[in-house]
Amino acid sequence: MRESEPTVVLGIDPGTAVTGYGIVRKDGHNALVLIECGVIRTKPSDALAHRLSDIHDGVAELIRRHKPTVLAIEDIFYARNVRTTVVLGHARGVILLAGAQAGMDIHEYPPSEIKKAVAGTGAATKLQVQFMVTRLLRLKSAPQPTDAADGVAAALTWALAPELPKIEPIRRLAVMETRRQH
C-alpha cells in the first residue's frame, strides 16, 4: 500500500453484553479521523449462541458499511472467574471470524498495551483513555459509553504505532491533567 492511501481501522473492545467499536481513518499524512463509534448490545436474556450471532452480525454490518481493511481488537484478559474468560473468548472468536471472512489484517493487543498506546501508561483508567481518545482525535466530546471509547482506543493503537515516540509527551500531560481533575 502506498503511504498516501487512507486506511480504515475497526477497533473492537469485545464483550458479550456490550461490544464497543470505533472506526478510524488514517490518511497518508497520518491525520486521524473518527468515522463512527458506538456499541453493539445483546440481550442478557438471550441464549449465548444468539448473543454471539448478534455480535457477529453487528460487526459484519460495520465491515460491510465502512469497508475497513484493519481489525484491531483487545486481547483477552484473565478474569478471576473462568467462565467470564471463556465467554469473552467466544465473543472474540465471532469478531475475529467476521474480520477473517472479510479478509482483514487482524491485530490483537493486550488491554495494557492499548492503554499505554493512547494514555501513556498500561495502568491508565477508563477516564484517562477516554480523555486521550478525545484529545488525539480533537473531538468536541468524549465517545460514550466508555466501551465505545475503548473500541476507538484499540483502533488508535494500530494507527498510532509508528507515531508513538512523538506523542509520548502529549500523553504524559494528559495523564497529569486527568489526575488533577480527580
Regions of interest found by a model, annotated:
Residues 1-182:
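Phosphate- and other anionic-substrate recognition elements at nucleic-acid/protein interfaces
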